[in-house]
Amino acid sequence: MARPIYVRFDVPPELASKSLEALELARDTGRIKKGTNEATKAVERGVAKLVIIGEDVEPPEIVAHLPPLCEEKNTPYVYVKKQSDVGAAAGLSVKSAAAAIIEPGKGKELLEEIIQKLQALK
C-alpha cells in the first residue's frame, strides 16, 4: 500500500507501540481526547501533549489537516499503522482515526521520551 498523503515521516514500530502505551496510561491515569474532532479541538486550544494518528484512515482527508495543524501549534504527533490500535488504546471497541493525550498521568516520563525521539526523526 502506498503511503497516505498526510504521513510526513516514518515512525519506527517500537516508537509507535510506546505511543499507544502512553495513550493507554493517559486513558487510565490522566486525560485523553478520542477521535479526530476532539483531537483537532485539543490541538487548536493548545492543550494536546501528543497526537496519535492512524496511517490506514480512509478517506485520508479525514485526518490530513492534523499534521500541518500540529506543526503550526508546535504539538508533537506520531503515526501508528492501524486506527484500530488507536481505538483500542483509547478504550474504544471501535477504531479511531486519531486521539490526543491531554494529561499523561503516570505516563509522563514515557511521553517525554517519545517527544524527544520524535524530534530526532524530523
From Swiss-Prot:
<protein>
    <recommendedName>
        <fullName>Large ribosomal subunit protein eL8</fullName>
    </recommendedName>
</protein>
<keyword id="KW-0687">Ribonucleoprotein</keyword>
<keyword id="KW-0689">Ribosomal protein</keyword>
<dbReference type="InterPro" id="IPR018492">
    <property type="entry name" value="Ribosomal_eL8/Nhp2"/>
</dbReference>
<dbReference type="GO" id="GO:1990904">
    <property type="term" value="C:ribonucleoprotein complex"/>
</dbReference>
<dbReference type="GO" id="GO:0003735">
    <property type="term" value="F:structural constituent of ribosome"/>
</dbReference>
<dbReference type="InterPro" id="IPR022481">
    <property type="entry name" value="Ribosomal_eL8_arc"/>
</dbReference>
<dbReference type="GO" id="GO:0005840">
    <property type="term" value="C:ribosome"/>
</dbReference>
<keyword id="KW-0819">tRNA processing</keyword>
<dbReference type="GO" id="GO:0001682">
    <property type="term" value="P:tRNA 5'-leader removal"/>
</dbReference>
<dbReference type="InterPro" id="IPR050257">
    <property type="entry name" value="eL8/uL1-like"/>
</dbReference>
<keyword id="KW-0699">rRNA-binding</keyword>
<comment type="function">
    <text>Multifunctional RNA-binding protein that recognizes the K-turn motif in ribosomal RNA, the RNA component of RNase P, box H/ACA, box C/D and box C'/D' sRNAs.</text>
</comment>
<keyword id="KW-0963">Cytoplasm</keyword>
<dbReference type="Pfam" id="PF01248">
    <property type="entry name" value="Ribosomal_L7Ae"/>
</dbReference>
<dbReference type="InterPro" id="IPR029064">
    <property type="entry name" value="Ribosomal_eL30-like_sf"/>
</dbReference>
<dbReference type="GO" id="GO:0006412">
    <property type="term" value="P:translation"/>
</dbReference>
<comment type="similarity">
    <text>Belongs to the eukaryotic ribosomal protein eL8 family.</text>
</comment>
<dbReference type="GO" id="GO:0005737">
    <property type="term" value="C:cytoplasm"/>
</dbReference>
<dbReference type="InterPro" id="IPR004038">
    <property type="entry name" value="Ribosomal_eL8/eL30/eS12/Gad45"/>
</dbReference>
<dbReference type="GO" id="GO:0004526">
    <property type="term" value="F:ribonuclease P activity"/>
</dbReference>
<comment type="subunit">
    <text>Part of the 50S ribosomal subunit. Probably part of the RNase P complex.</text>
</comment>
<dbReference type="GO" id="GO:0019843">
    <property type="term" value="F:rRNA binding"/>
</dbReference>
<keyword id="KW-0694">RNA-binding</keyword>
